[in-house]
């Protein structure tokens, strides 16, 4: 069985791409058709590529790898934090700070400062300081927490990045490429897929689509960490046979507005 069914993808709106005037021609192989100026993503391919991404992330986790979930757009922030936390991994869901990967030592110093400020708030140090100074330190702590809280306990540079909308997260993509860190990403029709190692063709603007696929990547981490190989994902060829006829008809009906 595939990790995600065609029905789940349709219900989450994964098939809706961007307007045709805002496309990247390199995404053409993953486009099913066009409707009312919107590209419709080929979900038959998405089903198979989610399986590939799932197995990839699962294998990284099984080897003790670190997975960093990245998504700073509003539609992704909650899912990124919740699913990364559920999987026992790390996340960036607000602004990506330049150098997060390529200048990790500096980032670690800021994380140390965050931990220091947290300790000061907990051990009563703030109670002995002037109110104005406490206000300044509290504001500093909140800012650091916002940007670094999701990687506060990350032990090292991650082994893989999972990104929602790499078109928006270009700095993260470039840093990962510079350090040869593989990227798994939800890639919409306006994005260059060549920058991504394992792509998942998908609507990256719909909250339900982001939540569905991000949750599956978290599931992959959890399964990998548990070493549960008894629930193997079906090979891509078998998946194609399972979804090709009936599910493609569902997609056509959805695109054409039929019941």
Curated annotation (Swiss-Prot):
Residues 224-259 are annotated as: Disordered. GO terms for molecular function: structural constituent of ribosome. Residues 238-248 have a biased composition (Acidic residues). One of its GO terms (cellular component) is cytosolic small ribosomal subunit. InterPro entries: Ribosomal_uS2, Ribosomal_uS2_bac/mit/plastid, Ribosomal_uS2_CS, Ribosomal_uS2_flav_dom_sf. GO terms for biological process: translation. Residues 250-259 have a biased composition (Polar residues). Pfam families: Ribosomal_S2. It comes from the Bacteria. SUPFAM superfamilies: Ribosomal protein S2. Keywords: Ribonucleoprotein, Ribosomal protein. NCBIfam families: rpsB_bact. Belongs to the universal ribosomal protein uS2 family. This is Small ribosomal subunit protein uS2. The gene is rpsB.
